[in-house]
């Protein structure tokens, strides 16, 4: 078979069409004694069902049995005796069932004289069914699938337009379920999935034209969705059996009926029924029960001939065991009698397990061929094929040329390499078909070229050999710096494919081994190089279908190449390629590829997005711990792979565009290449900036150290906290809350004690750049600014002086005591602002540190355009540290804008008059009490939401809602006594609270919907963010009402 693929006379270039490759009839190979026969069948392939066919070479001695045997052998069929061979004339209803003993050449000469070869269709069909055939076929999957496709085709051609709408809908939905059995039961509810089925696949493949024409599109869609849900849980085999169950009452596909007469004249007109259950029986009327004539094991001989009258009818005689005389049947023509004889003979051979025919007829020249050549064992076949070429002239079992995939099979003669020029080396990997070895190619241009050699373990099988060479014949068409280059092939057994050697191996292993040495720019560079290779494939109309880090090879530290083209396909004139079977990489595949086995450049884009994610994750596989069957469910629920650590947001945004559910919304590879180029350049610029900043920082640290090993008691600069600190320094309780978080960025000790670094461990200074320090340590930088004491210490250190150990110890102890005193004072003064100031967005801290505050400098409680609350009174300065708090305020850094746990007076220390909430009597203030109640409800929900199961979300949100309703009712009672000019602003604040509650409920529903997925935590965070917004806006409402009250008091105050 492989030889046929490699023969340029039998194959076409990638731009030609498979449909015009061969006619329905035959062709002769130039200079050969063989002829070529195209046989249509129902073995599934990726082409349209109407083009499923095999091309078979045959000699003059080949009989029909040999043709059937060769086709079914390639599909590993068990019930070979069930198959028959039909010849149909395409321009008339003329049909001939060819007996297995008939010679193919004689048949062709006989019938092709009557009509041109292209008007005849040779077809392999299942004709002879055993009793309980469905149960037997379930153990022979190729036969079951073949029979299903055959029956479905007959149904669509013959009766589909006449059946009830309900039956047509069920049968069509069962075919959808069988074809796309991995698709979830509710997949057709998605508009994009239904549109793929409707526009790309075509509804006419599943439903009759009468149904599609008579029902409106919107109604039809609803009917299909409703019907499909009935079969949502069926697998492929169950769908097939259910199809037969629904179809059998309206279409008897398990028997054949012939209108004829019993006897030698038209005395009794009957309908003769022949099938596995009835045997041979007849019906006189449609409504009556069949009358049994004989079983197949009772038939001893079969004869047929022309009648002697002028009508030249066909006569069929069956000798039945125990019957006094033969059973005679008169058929309308000799052809029908001959077809009936073939059917009964096939059943007799099947029931008796015989190969010898039961038909007795006079021998006519050319009518019967020599007996079939017995089937040889594999070793005997191999021995025969190693002889001279002339043996092929008498070998009736020549190769089959399946039309599937022939579009990527040009000649390999230019790439053939002599085996003696290859030195096979050590094994460096394992492929789908065999091992991959390192070797040397002794070529004239390069006497010692290092190469990779793919070997094939089981290439004695023609089908395996073809699939193995498929990759080479695909690769030979590519020439790109980031695609592995084909050097040559050896097509004689053992078959080898010789490719360029990428010395650093596959990308996934490379990323895992060098996880800590590869920088972000290198990872983005790899993604960019792959995008250029895939843009090249897209331009040549190829789909790769297996884009993953394991299939990318590393040529050097700055060069990767796309390899493994075993699944690649040329798309011809079609916009997509459909895979019919075989193992596919589910966790990398696009949803339409999983659901419909539909592969396009857009599905390659999805896979490339997953491959980029693998690269940024240093070789981690996607959807770890998730079963293949569960992947599509998660994707359809909106789940996507999370953002990798240190991944630029622009790059992750590009990945998510690649993972758009609708293929039409994904970018093309040309766009991806351009955007990745931009991201790469940006990362290089940032990398250079970080290196310059790091150099300056190292220089500063080196200058500050002054040759001393002493660590400073506190960070020396507000924007650049030194990683060094004293062993006696302990962070405040605010910092202790997030110990785990800080261990990443500068608190590796188990008790939060900072590690010694600086000049002692210079390598640690570059672990985090300035941006990362700000992200990881906002509170630390804003909290610990140098006091006068620290400045003195730094001055001493700068002059090269070292404090005595006992003075250093005293200073550290005193400093720790002062910090504890500061903390107690701050906690006391915290009560100055009401309600609880810890309710700022981002400051309602949970232990997991999920929330970050806004990035602006405005305090979160204060509405835009409103003054800040008054600052608390300043603490009297300690001796030796005057103005400590004012210094802290005056040198506040941008890091304070994170506002994560930072107290409000640190953000806005200046005093503002009049304070909106501080100087009012709250003794009977119902609005204030209800705002406080709402805030408490939010705090309670925030503390309970993390461990709570989804069913407890509703009661917690309900408590918040009740608190809000009470607050709004109180505000409604308060509004009439306030100035009319303030009503509008209060109503707007109320509407904002209602909107906040709606957002909270929406996020709660999402958190419940995506429970047990990786998105659950994300939606919990969004739920808490919405609750925090509600609390903050409630405080804003209180501020608005307080200002209205102050305005009212100002109007009533005597001048």
From Swiss-Prot:
Sites bearing Phosphotyrosine, chain numbering: 5, 397, 407, 570, 576-577, 861, 928
Major localization listed first in the record, in broad terms: other
InterPro entries from the UniProt entry: Band_41_domain (IPR019749), FADK_N (IPR041390), FAK1-like_FERM_C (IPR049385), FAK1/PYK2_FERM_C (IPR041784), FERM/acyl-CoA-bd_prot_sf (IPR014352), FERM_2 (IPR035963), FERM_central (IPR019748), FERM_domain (IPR000299)
Assembly and interaction partners: Interacts with GIT1. Component of a complex that contains at least FER, CTTN and PTK2/FAK1. Interacts with BMX. Interacts with STEAP4. Interacts with ZFYVE21. Interacts with ESR1. Interacts with PIK3R1 or PIK3R2. Interacts with FGR, FLT4 and RET. Interacts with EPHA2 in resting cells; activation of EPHA2 recruits PTPN11, leading to dephosphorylation of PTK2/FAK1 and dissociation of the complex. Interacts with EPHA1 (kinase activity-dependent). Interacts with P53/TP53. Interacts (via first Pro-rich region) with CAS family members (via SH3 domain), including BCAR1, BCAR3, and CASS4.
Positions of the catalytic residues: 546 (proton acceptor)
Interaction with TGFB1I1: annotated span: 707-1055
Ranges of biased composition (kind: Pro residues): 869-880
Region forming the signal peptide: none
Recorded catalytic activity of this chain's protein: L-tyrosyl-[protein] + ATP = O-phospho-L-tyrosyl-[protein] + ADP + H(+)
SMART domains referenced in this protein's UniProt entry, alphabetically: B41, TyrKc
Keywords assigned: Acetylation, Angiogenesis, ATP-binding, Cell junction, Cell membrane, Cell projection, Cytoplasm, Cytoskeleton, Developmental protein, Isopeptide bond, Kinase, Membrane, Nucleotide-binding, Nucleus, Phosphoprotein, Transferase, Tyrosine-protein kinase, Ubl conjugation
UniProt-annotated stretches for the region Disordered: 1-29, 685-734, 837-923
Enzyme class, first EC level, given as a word: transferase
Function of the molecule: Non-receptor protein-tyrosine kinase that plays an essential role in regulating cell migration, adhesion, spreading, reorganization of the actin cytoskeleton, formation and disassembly of focal adhesions and cell protrusions, cell cycle progression, cell proliferation and apoptosis. Required for early embryonic development and placenta development. Required for embryonic angiogenesis, normal cardiomyocyte migration and proliferation, and normal heart development.
Glycyl lysine isopeptide (Lys-Gly) (interchain with G-Cter in SUMO) cross-link, renumbered residues: 152
Membrane-spanning segments: none
UniProt remark on domains: The first Pro-rich domain interacts with the SH3 domain of CAS family members, such as BCAR1 and NEDD9. The C-terminal region is the site of focal adhesion targeting (FAT) sequence which mediates the localization of FAK1 to focal adhesions.
Domain FERM: 35-355
Gene that specifies this protein: Ptk2
Composition-biased stretches (Basic and acidic residues): 685-697, 837-849
Region (Interaction with ARHGEF28): 915-1055
Listed name of the protein: Focal adhesion kinase 1
Disulfide-bond pairs as recorded: none
Membrane topology: Peripheral membrane protein
Organism: Rattus norvegicus
Protein location: Cell junction, Focal adhesion; Cell membrane; Cytoplasm, Perinuclear region; Cytoplasm, Cell cortex
An annotated GO cellular component: lamellipodium
Annotated ATP binding sites: 428-434, 454, 500-502
